[in-house]
């Protein structure tokens, strides 16, 4: 059975308990596979990026046919940190839902010119709403960029989360953790990497030597991951810093963090 997330975000827990560890947030419009239905309206699900956990039934829409159609039609994502979907194309209109960066929508006006101020979108429930056109971007389903462009795009995507508060298990501008930041930077550029802070076989990130490291590659530490920006700098969702920020591997740099620079366990790269 397949389903679509219809909440702003579906919290994914390590156990079927609201007090259990939050391990991920599945964003609006993302499809999930229902592996098991449990009592008390809990579901055990697998995301499209192959991460598993427990979510609540009322956060998703159950319907194989609707989900399959949605996967084919919904090819746009929210590019803004937050965006309100409104009932009418005017700022005074009633809000239907607020969505975060990376949420998936069906662009009903996909053939209109890019200078149209408002775009009609369809929600997973079938409801039509409107949002500012510049806040909606085509979804990159698969990475097709040449290496230099891809690396630059991943870096810019990661930097768009600067100052986002740290949230364990978070994956949005409301709050994000280290692996959530890196996985979203790659996902929004068409590459699925493992959600947690380690290199896992079966995913495209492979270990390389540090002398080959370039911008867009990943630095792994014990229980932590960061994205390399080049020039000794890296961006990460730092529990110690309370938010997404930039630090340096260079001990002479004012942004140097010795605790991280001296504990690198691996460098990971798509290339």
Swiss-Prot record:
- InterPro entries recorded: NLP_P60_dom (IPR000064), Papain-like_cys_pep_sf (IPR038765), Peptidase_C40 (IPR051202), SH3-like_bac-type (IPR003646)
Which taxonomic lineage is given here? Bacteria, Bacillati, Bacillota, Bacilli, Bacillales
What are the entry keywords? Cytoplasm, Hydrolase, Protease, Sporulation, Thiol protease
Domain SH3b residues, every copy: 1-64, 72-140
Q: Where in the cell is it found?
A: Cytoplasm
What organism does the UniProt record list as the source?
Answer: Lysinibacillus sphaericus (Bacillus sphaericus)
Protein name, please?
Dipeptidyl-peptidase 6
Mind telling me which Pfam families this protein's record contains? NLPC_P60, SH3_3
Active site (UniProt): 178 (nucleophile), 224 (proton acceptor), 236
Q: Which residues form the NlpC/P60 domain?
A: 148-268
């Amino acid at each position: 059975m397949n389903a679509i997330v219809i909440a702003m975000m579906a919290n994914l827990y390590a156990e079927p308990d609201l007090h259990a560890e939050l391990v991920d947030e599945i964003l609006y419009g993302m499809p999930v596979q229902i592996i098991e239905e449990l009592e008390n309206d809990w579901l055990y699900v697998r995301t499209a990026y192959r991460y598993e956990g427990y979510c609540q039934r009322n956060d998703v829409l159950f319907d194989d046919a609707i989900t399959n159609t949605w996967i084919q039609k919904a090819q746009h994502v929210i590019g803004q940190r937050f965006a309100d979907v409104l009932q009418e194309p005017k700022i005074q209109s009633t809000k239907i839902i607020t969505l975060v960066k990376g949420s998936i929508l069906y662009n009903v006006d996909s053939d209109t010119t890019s200078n149209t101020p408002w775009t009609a979108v369809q929600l997973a429930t079938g409801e039509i709403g409107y949002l500012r056109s510049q806040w909606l971007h085509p979804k990159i389903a698969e990475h097709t960029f040449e290496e230099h462009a891809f690396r630059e795009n991943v870096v810019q995507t990661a930097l768009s989360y600067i100052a986002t508060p740290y949230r364990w298990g978070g994956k949005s501008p409301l709050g994000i953790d280290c692996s959530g930041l890196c996985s979203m930077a790659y996902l929004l550029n068409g590459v699925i990497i493992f959600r947690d802070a380690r290199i896992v076989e079966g995913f495209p990130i492979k270990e390389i030597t540090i002398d080959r490291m370039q911008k867009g590659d990943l630095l792994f530490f014990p229980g932590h991951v960061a994205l390399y920006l080049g020039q000794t700098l890296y961006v990460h969702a730092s529990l110690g810093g309370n938010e997404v920020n930039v630090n340096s591997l260079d001990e002479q740099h004012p942004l140097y963090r010795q605790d991280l620079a001296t504990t690198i366990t691996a460098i990971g790269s798509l290339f």
